[in-house]
Amino acid sequence: MRPLSFAYLNFVLILSLILSACGFELRNYANSLDNQTISLDANNSFLNLEMENQLNLKGYLNPSYDSQSTISIKILNHVVNRYVGSAGPGATTTQVRLDYKILYSLKINGARETQHTFEDISYIDFNQSDLLAFEREEEITKEDFIRKAIRNLEFVISANLNEIK
């Protein structure tokens, strides 16, 4: 073993020991919604069904508690708009901009209903010959939009719950 690699190994070992000793850990999203029951009111669009599916996977929705739910979410508008632009010689390279927007009303513990909006933008580059790959990429991007919207929703609900306390 060379002296340089031994010194590097010692450095990494000491650094990891220091970081673990001071309580450092990777980002962990708050689970302040674990003991809350959430009801979701939305139409049967693809985006709303995907959001409902992701909320179910996190364990936030429980259909048996609909009448007793402490948090009520009503999705008013949920859209992804697609804008296409071409650049380059012969316009062979195309870039698509996906604009995501969700408008929802939130009611916590029977308090006043408030409206919230979350917006996000993503750009996808693709070649005309890779149309199937682009469609899959667009689907993945929509799922990512919904994950970000749920994180934002968790933040808004947690902030409102802290204000109520």
Region annotations inferred by a language model:
Residues 1-11:
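Bacterial N-terminal signal peptides that target proteins for export
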Residues 18-21:
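C-terminal motif of bacterial Sec signal peptides marking the signal peptidase cleavage site
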Residues 23-25:
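Bacterial signal peptide processing site
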Residues 30-79:
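N-terminal segment of the mature soluble domain
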Residues 55, 59, 106-110, 153-161:
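Sec/Tat-exported extracytoplasmic proteins
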Residues 72-117, 123-139, 151:
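Surface-exposed short loop/turn segments
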Residues 132-165:
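C-terminal/domain-edge helix-coil "capping" segments
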